[in-house]
Design a protein with these regions (language model features):
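N-terminal flexible/basic segments that precede or flank functional cores
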Residues: 1-24, 28-29
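DNA major-groove recognition helix of helix-turn-helix/homeodomain DNA-binding modules
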Residues: 60-75
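Conserved hydrophobic/aromatic packing and binding residues within compact polymer-binding modules
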Residues: 22, 36-37, 47-50, 76
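Short basic helix-loop element that most often maps to the first helix and adjoining turn
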Residues: 20-35, 39, 64
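Recognition helix of helix-turn-helix/homeodomain-like DNA-binding domains
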Residues: 41-55
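Short acidic/histidine-centered micro-motifs embedded in hydrophobic/aromatic stretches
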Residues: 79
Length: 79
């Protein structure tokens, strides 16, 4: 079984990588979680869960985050 893979949660690795990428882009843009959450019109606690890989988010939220980060959606998947 690949590292980071769990039969209970087969997408755990990808969620973590997505969250790390969002955090990296946020840090690179000099934004706090609160700042990005405000720009993306999402709850800061939900953003924290996304960045930590704890939730399966939706395309809607990924679009909001990309807009808040001022990057194309595909940039969120460049990990």
């Amino acid at each position: 079984m690949p590292v980071g893979y769990s039969s209970d949660n087969p997408f755990q690795r990808e969620r973590k990588l997505l969250g790390q990428t969002i955090k990296h882009l946020r840090d690179k843009g000099g934004m706090t979680q609160e700042g990005l959450a405000e720009k993306a019109s999402i709850n800061v606690s939900y953003l924290a869960k996304i960045e930590n890989g704890y939730v399966n988010t939706t395309v809607r939220y990924l679009i909001k985050l990309a807009r808040g980060l001022k990057v194309p959606v595909k940039a969120l998947f460049e990990f």
